[in-house]
A protein has these predicted regions:
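Beta-rich carbohydrate-recognition and catalytic domains
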Residues: 1-232, 236, 242-281, 294, ...
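Extracellular glycan-recognition regions
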Residues: 312-530
Length: 530
């Protein structure tokens, strides 16, 4: 995981990852300045090393001289061994209110050169001649990661076509959406997707996936929207993938900060939505897909502060994308975490957390890896003896009766501060809370309680589920029947007891496995601090 350092007043923004020759290449925005696109590499998708930045804002007067926004890197279908980066740029001329798309190319993924543009610098027509001469002399004479050469025949920077999309600052929100490019090639034709907005309808319901077709190398023609759900303000960071012949459109929704998807049999047909179309729970945003030698991966940043997504952002481990027999997409645990598994913890060593309870029935039986737990009244937790920081817990959990159950982890046995994971196996609801104690004498504020994330699932087998809980550094992941339901980062608690809690309930745990994980080799701020 990595984040920007607090002292730098920077945070990670949208990400894009490409796997090539055994290396994962991570490109990401840097917030709030948006003045360059950073680049890092990894062999395991978990530990990263920063390399030279890939791209920079243009010099004053260029179309991208204010900010750089989301990018997408893919192989150039017209030139073997070359890579293309489509990216979003904002200009000072428009005060950052108009988004356009540009292109840069590279032969090695490390050294990038901006492609020619038709944009001209019209500043200062009344400037004194010495000032005009100084401006001419200061301009670069060749393309690089900052400067693009002029070509009147270039189609870049791309702008929204007013025939299909909002394209004027006089329309809609007075703020033109045309960002987050994604290049998709179906084997015959190439298409460029972008977050755009149709021209009609309620203003905050115009968000669509804009579409352009590559008619010749580096030249694109506008098409009608690939998908307009008639519901959202924007569909950010769109992606299209082909899985077993079906197409899936993945986008991030600003309204609830979730990653959703739609599906269709072939491009051009209407897009449909499943009853459950959320890939990752709230807080996971700007989802990007990439393919490695094992299949599709879903990447995103997690925002620990939903009220300000320009700060406290972390990149969590990727999720493997799989397709169910019924066609739904599911995010599952990235198998690379297995390399960090260490000692097995004896799950027969378990005890009740609260000793000073009144007369009631409490049962804790351990038999060959199975556990029978009962609490007749009130709250009780049964925790494993060993203190744990990083771990993976797996079990089949079965509830009996109508009581409540859940899990606790990184729990202080004295104050009982830690993480509380509420589980409703009948309705399919998981809710993670951080519950702690404030400063002495802080009155009503001494109780510290935060709802961190909620996730939902459907299962035919009510009251029973295969569960997996991973705590790896500040990363927390919870899966039900192999599907990731919760995925987040939180830094409140770092070690303590792990166990199962009951409220007037009886549960059975079978196939219980608990293993320590090696501590992450890198801190959350490793990449941004060097």
């Amino acid at each position: 995981m990595f984040s920007e350092t607090d002292g730098s007043r920077k945070a990670i923004g949208d990400v894009d990852v490409l796997f090539h020759a055994g290396l994962y290449h991570l490109f990401h925005l840097v917030l709030p300045n948006h003045d360059f696109i950073a680049h890092a590499v990894s062999t395991d998708a978990l530990n990263w090393r920063r390399v030279n930045n890939a791209l920079f804002i243009g010099d004053p007067g260029n179309w991208d001289d204010l900010m750089l926004w989301t990018m997408h890197v893919s192989p150039d279908p017209h030139h073997n061994g070359r890579w293309r980066m489509f990216y979003t740029g904002l200009s000072r001329r428009d005060h950052g209110k108009y988004q356009r798309l540009g292109l840069a190319t590279s032969d090695d993924l490390f050294h990038w050169k901006k492609s020619p543009v038709h944009w001209e610098d019209h500043r200062g027509p009344q400037d004194p001649e010495p000032v005009k001469e100084a401006l001419r002399r200061s301009r670069s004479t060749q393309a690089d990661s900052r400067h693009a050469m002029f070509d009147a025949d270039s189609c870049f920077p791309l702008e929204p076509d007013p025939k299909h999309y909002e394209a004027s600052l006089d329309e809609g929100r007075r703020w033109v959406s045309f960002r987050d490019p994604f290049f998709y090639h179906d084997g015959t034709d190439g298409f460029l997707l972008a977050a755009g907005r149709v021209k009609v309808g309620p203003i905050v319901r115009r968000g669509c996936v804009a579409l352009m077709k590559e008619t010749s190398p580096g030249h694109f023609e506008s098409q009608p929207a690939l998908h307009h759900p008639h519901l959202y303000d924007d569909i950010e960071v769109p992606n299209v993938i082909n899985v077993d012949g079906d197409h899936y459109l993945i986008g991030s929704i600003r309204e609830d900060a979730k990653i959703r998807y739609w599906y269709t049999g072939k491009l051009g047909d209407p897009w449909a939505s499943y009853h459950d179309n959320v890939l990752l729970a709230q807080g996971n945003y700007a989802g990007r897909v990439s393919r490695d030698d094992k299949g599709w991966l879903l990447w995103n940043f997690f925002s620990m502060n939903l009220s300000d997504r320009t700060a406290e952002n972390l990149i969590t481990p990727p999720k493997r994308l799989v397709r169910t027999d019924s066609g739904l997409l599911r995010a599952v645990t990235f198998e690379g975490i297995d390399a960090h598994l260490r000692q097995t913890v004896d799950t027969r060593c378990i005890h009740s957390l609260i000793e000073d309870v009144g007369p009631q029935v409490e049962i804790c039986q351990a038999d060959e890896g199975d556990l029978e737990l009962t609490c007749q009244s009130g709250f009780q937790a049964f925790v494993f003896d060993e203190k744990l920081d990083h771990f993976r817990f797996q079990a089949k959990l079965e509830t009996q009766g109508v009581g409540k159950c859940g899990m606790v982890f990184r729990l202080d046995p004295v104050t009982r501060d830690g993480y509380y994971l509420s589980l409703d196996l009948l309705k399919g609801v998981a809710q993670l809370r951080a519950w702690g104690t404030g400063a002495d004498g802080s009155g009503e504020h001494m109780m510290q309680f935060a709802s961190l994330q909620a996730g939902f699932w459907f299962s035919e087998d009510h009251g029973s589920a295969e569960v997996q809980l991973i705590a790896f550094g500040s990363y927390i992941e919870f899966s039900i029947n192999g599907r990731v339901v919760l995925s987040l980062a939180d830094q409140r608690f770092d070690a303590g007891n792990l166990g199962v809690y009951l409220e007037a309930a009886k549960v059975r745990l079978s196939n219980v496995h608990l293993q320590r994980l090696a501590s992450p080799r890198q801190t959350d701020d490793h990449l941004v601090s060097g």
